[in-house]
Curated annotation (Swiss-Prot):
Full protein name: Pre-mRNA-splicing factor CWC22
GO MF annotation list: RNA binding
Lyase listed as a keyword: no
Compartments (UniProt record): Cytoplasm; Nucleus
Key word Ubl conjugation present: no
InterPro entries: ARM-type_fold, CWC22_splicing_factor, Initiation_fac_eIF4g_MI, MIF4G-like_typ-3
Domain MI: 460-576
Subunit structure: Associated with the spliceosome.
Domain MIF4G: 174-357
Single GO cellular component term: catalytic step 2 spliceosome
Family: Belongs to the CWC22 family.
Originating species: Cryptococcus neoformans var. neoformans serotype D (strain JEC21 / ATCC MYA-565)
Length: 831
């Protein structure tokens, strides 16, 4: 193009407000524009602004927009716009969406062979980098969708030795320990402990110590619970308990130096309860007290008082001298008066708490005495020791022997919990189920291995029953509420005991309790048996109760018996005799029977006692085996106004002699029959001797009669004289016979004379009887002995038997010593 033309074509700078030249317009020189100049004038301009907003002078330079025709071969993709509050997360999401759009655009163009593979590889690398960043940061790193995160975790879990898997397990361990510690309390501590042992507490002991200290500092009322938890774990894993104690002492020292009263109070409270649980030695408690009381200030006194209230009972039992020294120091500080009135009042309250024996601050609360003192391991860590708090245990660190350490802890866990589930993986399905059953059977006793020796459940049950009874308006409401109480199987007797104890505590008997017992007895057989068992127990121990309690208990059981709540067969435990009863038991039986008579009447009670089926149960109350016991029982029941029930025993006493005689006869017959069966020869010989004795006695009676007849008629037969000559004595002189025969009548009947003699002297003394033989009024005794000289040497005291010789059947042995010569001689066997 000519230079002149180019100079004329190049336009001057113009303002944007100027309108472009029209195609048919011409220059001032009268020449038209060339076609090369048309595109320069074919651009779109922005609308003209308001004339008032136009600048005073046009711009010196013009900015021309990039022509779209020059970059028509590049694909233009708009950057996605993501709305998110977090700028880092918004940027990451925008990059991800942009990458996705680029891949889709390249796939549409057909260039997927090289570019797409490179893009996918970079995406995986980015994801892994984000996952590594997630594991290495506290905040969690960039956002990863849950599904993608689970996929990455599953991929990392394939290699258990990798740092990623160890970090995942570390995070899970930390969350589990925190969750279990945050939800522990008195009621569920027995279930939390096995779950804690299920986690690797050796690897996570730092996490456990940090978590339990944080939880205790944020909730001081639960300090005894956390101390009991640490005490249980300390019995199996002492290094865990020692680490907690070391960190607590270190934290107390730092807080004391910083004058942080809140942290000092929380930490000292935890240490006090660890001392109560025998995890920490009492030396550290005494050191803390002496440190706080050495240079007393208001804050140190407040910490010391709070610490002493928690550990005072423990020190009074285990270190009484040191405890007295501490209280003497408290008294000295109080008398010095250098502290505020508030702290002085706190010390006075502490002395009152000590006087009350720490009833509101027990060393170990109810339900937390879960460890035997012999099993506990006590750590002697003091304030002056060099402590290793091991803060590195709170942070994650890859373990090159991770798998081996996990297996070791699994062995420890099986030893603690009795769990054996590692061998079930290589067995069949049936064997696997059997092994699970065996595991359950093995684990169950271990869970119950932490025995509660304080009977907390029993105490809570009794408290519930007592409050339920006291809060009821009538017996029906009480029974309805008590039936809803969850009473363990085999503990039904506790409800009966509580009802009876509540009844005994009243000033006077209330029928409210009797109706409760009656309703329970009629609801189910279990309660009937329980109240019958309670009757036997209270009868055996009734001597322990006061008179008022005894009366209430007796009336309660009297109501149950009268209403047929319990069987009358329970009275078999009553033995009414002097040896087996006491004054308390007799009073108890009296009150029971009087209550029964008051409700039923004496007639019905007496009829009930006569029921044949129940008589064996009443054998002890109405004894008929011994007159002494029967007499005692009759006197007892008569004295209490129940003589009507003793009629059978009175009849027994009347017939007792006859019964005793019959019993003795039967006993003698039994003994004789036993002796008769010894030998047949003894029986025959004894029968022969008895027959000989009987024959001799009969012959003697006949001979004595004939002698009397002969003496009266003065003409004895020759046989009679022959028998007399056969006797040991010589023949009697006739003078003796004449003297004895003259006073008698010539021919009296022998029988009549004998009766007349008997009638004259029915019971004469010995001398009168001797005179009666001669019929003389006063015969000299010496003459009579002279007449009796026909016998060789008759002893004087034997002569009284001569008068008995006239009887029809005198004893055989005494016939030999009769003074009458006319008496026959004894049989030869008796000689």
């Amino acid at each position: 193009m000519p230079r002149s033309l180019s100079r004329s074509v190049s336009p001057r700078p113009r303002s944007p407000s100027l309108s472009p030249p029209r195609p048919d317009s011409r220059s001032s020189r009268g020449r038209s524009l060339t076609p090369d100049d048309i595109p320069a004038y074919k651009r779109k301009r922005s609308p003209s602004p308001n004339p008032r907003d136009r600048p005073a002078s046009p711009p010196t330079r013009r900015r021309r927009s990039q022509s779209p025709y020059r970059n028509s071969n590049r694909a233009e993709i708009d950057r996605p716009n993501v709305k998110d509050i977090d700028p880092n997360r918004r940027r990451a999401r925008e990059n991800a969406l942009l990458e996705k759009q680029i891949n889709m655009a390249l796939a549409d163009d057909g260039d997927a062979d090289g570019t797409v593979a490179t893009t996918k590889k970079s995406a995986d690398e980015i994801a892994r980098a984000e996952f590594a960043k997630l594991l290495g940061s506290r905040s969690g790193g960039a956002y990863i969708p849950p599904a993608k995160l689970r996929a990455m975790q599953a991929e990392a879990a394939k290699d258990k030795t990798s740092a990623e898997y160890q970090r995942i397990s570390w995070d899970a361990l930390k969350k589990s320990i925190n969750g279990l510690i945050n939800k522990v309390n008195i009621s569920n501590i027995k279930h939390i402990v096995p779950e804690l042992f299920g986690e690797n507490l050796i690897r996570g002991r730092g996490l456990f110590a940090r978590s339990v200290m944080r939880a205790q500092a944020s909730s001081l009322p639960f300090t005894p619970v956390f101390a009991a938890l640490v005490a249980i774990i300390n019995t199996k894993l002492p290094q865990v308990g020692e680490l907690v104690l070391i960190r607590l002492i270190s934290q107390f020292r730092r807080a004391y130096k910083r004058n942080d009263k809140t942290v000092c109070h929380a930490t000292s409270t935890f240490i006090a309860h660890l001392c109560n649980q025998y995890v920490a030695h009492e030396i550290v408690a005494l050191q803390i007290l002496l440190l706080c009381l050495d240079r007393p200030t208001d804050d140190s006194i407040e910490v010391a008082v709070g610490f002493m209230r928690e550990v005072g009972q423990f020190l009074s039992e285990n270190s009484p001298k040191a405890n007295n020294t501490v209280f003497e120091r408290f008294r000295a500080v109080l008398h010095e008066g250098q502290i505020s009135k508030r702290c002085q009042y706190m010390i006075e309250v502490l002395f009152q708490v000590r006087k009350d024996k720490y009833k509101d601050n027990p060393a170990v609360p109810e339900g937390l005495d879960l460890v035997e003192e012999e099993e506990q391991i006590t750590h002697r860590v003091t304030l002056d020791d060099e402590l290793q708090v091991q803060e590195s245990l709170n942070l994650f660190k890859a373990d090159p022997n991770f798998v081996q350490n996990e297996e070791r802890y699994n062995a420890i866990k099986r030893e603690i919990l009795g769990d054996s589930d590692d061998e079930s993986g290589t067995e069949s399905g049936s064997e696997y189920s059997e092994s699970e059953d065996d595991e359950d059977e093995d684990v169950a006793p271990e869970k119950a291995g932490i025995q509660d020796m304080t009977e907390t459940n029993l105490i809570n049950l009794r408290r519930t029953i007592y409050l339920t009874i006291m809060n009821s308006l009538n017996f029906e409401e009480a029974v309805h509420k008590l039936m809803k109480v969850n009473i363990p199987e085999g503990r039904e007797i506790e409800l009966c005991n509580m009802v009876i104890e509540c009844c005994s505590q009243e000033r006077t008997y209330s029928n409210f309790y009797g109706l409760i017992g009656e309703r329970f007895c009629k609801l189910h057989r279990i309660w009937t048996d329980a109240f019958q068992e309670a009757f036997q127990k209270y009868y055996d121990t009734i001597h322990r109760y006061e008179t008022n309690k005894l009366r209430n208990i007796g009336r309660f059981f009297g109501h149950l018996l009268a209403s047929d709540g319990i069987s009358w067969a329970v009275l078999h435990v009553v033995h009414m005799n002097e040896e087996e009863t006491t004054s308390s038991s007799r009073i108890f039986v009296k009150i029971v029977l009087q209550e029964m008579v008051e409700e039923m009447g004496i007639n019905r009670v007496a009829e009930r006692f006569r029921i044949p089926d129940l008589k064996p149960a009443f054998a002890g109350m109405f004894p008929m085996d011994n007159p002494k016991n029967a007499r005692f029982s009759i006197n007892y029941f008569t004295s209490i106004g129940m003589g009507k029930v003793t009629e059978d025993m009175r009849e027994y006493l009347q017939n007792a002699p006859k019964l005793l005689a019959a019993q003795q006869a039967a006993l003698a017959a039994a003994e004789s029959s036993d002796s008769d069966t010894d030998s047949s020869s003894d029986i025959s010989s004894s029968s022969d001797s008895d027959s000989d004795t009987d024959s001799d006695a009969s012959s003697y009676s006949r001979r004595s009669r004939r002698r009397r007849y002969s003496s009266d008629s003065r003409s004895p037969p020759p046989r009679r004289r022959r028998y007399s000559s056969d006797s040991r004595s010589p023949s009697p002189p006739p003078r003796r016979r004449q003297y004895s025969d003259e006073p008698r009548s010539p021919s009296p009947p022998p029988r009549r004379r004998r009766y007349s003699d008997d009638s004259r002297s029915p019971s004469p003394p010995p001398r009168r009887r001797y005179s009666g033989d001669s019929r003389s009024p006063s015969p000299p005794p010496r003459r009579r002995y002279a007449d009796d000289s026909r016998s060789p040497s008759p002893p004087p005291h034997r002569r009284r038997y001569s008068d008995d010789s006239r009887s029809p059947s005198p004893p055989p042995r005494r016939r030999r010593y009769s003074d009458n010569s006319r008496s026959p001689s004894p049989p030869p066997r008796r000689r």
